[in-house]
């Protein structure tokens, strides 16, 4: 599903960026994926996706 229509960014692209780079802030996420650069309507949904994905990332100290 498209999250950002202005830049054609999908939820899958956001999820992949979060899984690969583990951003902790929206600023960090925006450096990885072009969201919120035009109208800004996608920011809320992108943040929600980031929060959902961050909850699924297992910290390294729990893996060992």
Swiss-Prot record:
> What detail does the entry give on cofactor binding?
Binds 1 [2Fe-2S] cluster.
- Enumerate the UniProt keywords alphabetically: 2Fe-2S, Electron transport, Iron, Iron-sulfur, Metal-binding, Transport
Sites binding [2Fe-2S] cluster sit at 4, 6, 39, 42
One Pfam match: Fer2_BFD
Q: Does the keyword Transferase apply?
A: no
Specify the superkingdom: Bacteria
Electron transport recorded as keyword: yes
Its needed co-factors are: [2Fe-2S] cluster
A GO term for molecular function: 2 iron, 2 sulfur cluster binding
User: What InterPro entries is this protein classified in?
Assistant: BFD-associated_ferredoxin (IPR052371), BFD-like_2Fe2S-bd_dom (IPR007419), BFD-like_2Fe2S-bd_dom_sf (IPR041854)
The record's similarity note reads: Belongs to the Bfd family.
Q: What is the protein's quaternary organization?
A: Monomer. Interacts with bacterioferritin (BFR); up to 12 Bfd proteins can bind to the BFR.
The name this protein goes by in its record: Bacterioferritin-associated ferredoxin
Q: Which organism is it from?
A: Serratia marcescens
Underlying gene: bfd
């Amino acid at each position: 599903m498209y999250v950002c229509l202005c830049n054609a960014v999908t939820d899958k692209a956001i999820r992949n960026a979060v899984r690969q780079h583990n951003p902790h802030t929206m600023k960090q996420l925006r450096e990885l994926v072009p969201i919120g650069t035009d109208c800004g309507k996608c920011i809320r949904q992108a943040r929600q996706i980031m929060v959902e994905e961050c909850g699924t990332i297992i910290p390294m100290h729990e893996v060992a």
